C-alpha cells in the first residue's frame, strides 16, 4: 500500500530542510 513519510536529508537528495528532516510529506508505494 501507500503511506506518507518524511524525507530525511541527504546530500544531493532534495527536498531538504535545514539539513535535518524535511517538511514535505511524500507518498510512496511499498510492496506487501
Swiss-Prot record:
It comes from the Eukaryota. Belongs to the neurotoxin 10 (Hwtx-1) family. 30 (Jztx-14) subfamily. It holds the Pfam family Toxin_12. Probable ion channel inhibitor. The lineage of its organism: Eukaryota, Metazoa, Ecdysozoa, Arthropoda, Chelicerata. InterPro entries: Huwentoxin-1 (IPR011696). One of its GO terms (cellular component) is extracellular region. The modification Aspartic acid 1-amide is found at residue 31. It is found in: Secreted. Amidated as well as non-amidated forms are found in the venom. It comes from Chilobrachys guangxiensis. The keyword Disulfide bond applies. This is Jingzhaotoxin F4-32.60. The presence of a 'disulfide through disulfide knot' structurally defines this protein as a knottin. Its main location: secreted.
Amino acid at each position: 500500500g501507500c503511506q506518507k513519510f518524511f524525507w530525511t536529508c541527504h546530500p544531493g537528495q532534495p527536498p531538504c530542510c535545514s539539513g535535518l528532516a524535511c517538511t514535505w510529506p511524500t507518498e510512496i508505494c511499498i510492496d506487501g
